[in-house]
């Protein structure tokens, strides 16, 4: 979710940045996101905006484990089972968003389809997109590539990307985290001319 908020930030305040690293993002079908947002609105009529809907949560995350061998519903996050277990044990991670939170998230994601909004990203802002090629959020790189293409179509020209074989969503705690951190450090050194 953070990568979607980061991309929205780039559209509004990218001119305040010297660069950005976007990790684990995607570009879900617009109709799907719009339908999910509409569902939140309908459910809120009956249950209120503070309701925590398991239906919306399941629709948002249910298919993420598809095609993966896993012990838990959160295995899509990481190949490192110890990290998955830490995530599952953390009450700050294992909660259901309110309808209002989902609605706000879907509204923000829908803004990322608007060329006028994307035009706010500075054309020369250095961007690095990192993703695991087994990350379901990025549709195993297809969604990440669409996100990059949308920015290029908006005239943003300084975009680099790297996809990690077998890696899933949480790259900073993946089994290849040393490689990820080295790539981040290398990109930052290049951008900062160190």
Locate each region found by the language model.
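Catalytic nucleophile loop
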Residues: 2-3
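Alpha/beta-hydrolase-fold enzymes
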Residues: 6-92
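Active-site nucleophile elbow and catalytic-triad environment of alpha/beta-hydrolase enzymes
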Residues: 97-119
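Short, proline-enriched alpha-helix->beta-strand connector loops that line the catalytic pocket
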Residues: 121-127, 154-157
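Short beta-strand/loop motif that positions the catalytic acidic residue
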Residues: 129-131
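Acidic beta-to-alpha connecting loop that harbors the catalytic carboxylate
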Residues: 133-136, 167-168
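Conserved alpha/beta-hydrolase "acid-adjacent" motif
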Residues: 136-146
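Catalytic active-site module of serine/aspartate enzymes centered on a nucleophile-bearing elbow/loop
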Residues: 154, 158-194
């Amino acid at each position: 979710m953070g990568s979607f908020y980061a991309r929205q930030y780039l559209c509004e305040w990218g001119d305040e940045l010297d660069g950005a690293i976007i990790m684990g993002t995607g570009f879900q079908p617009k109709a799907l996101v719009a339908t999910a947002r509409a569902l939140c609105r309908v459910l809120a009529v009956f249950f209120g905006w503070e309701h925590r809907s398991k239906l919306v949560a399941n629709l948002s995350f249910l298919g993420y484990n598809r095609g993966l061998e896993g012990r838990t519903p959160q295995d899509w996050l990481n190949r490192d089972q110890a990290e998955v277990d830490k995530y599952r044990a953390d009450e700050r991670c294992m909660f259901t968003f309110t309808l209002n939170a989902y609605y706000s998230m879907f509204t923000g994601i829908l803004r990322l389809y608007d060329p006028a909004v994307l035009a706010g990203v500075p054309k020369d802002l250095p961007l690095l997109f990192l993703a695991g090629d087994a990350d379901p959020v990025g549709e195993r790189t297809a969604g990440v590539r669409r996100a990059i293409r949308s920015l290029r179509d908006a005239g943003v020209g300084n975009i680099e990307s790297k996809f990690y074989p077998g890696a899933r969503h949480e790259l900073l705690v993946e089994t290849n985290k040393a490689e990820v951190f080295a790539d981040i450090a290398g990109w930052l050194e290049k951008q900062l001319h160190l």
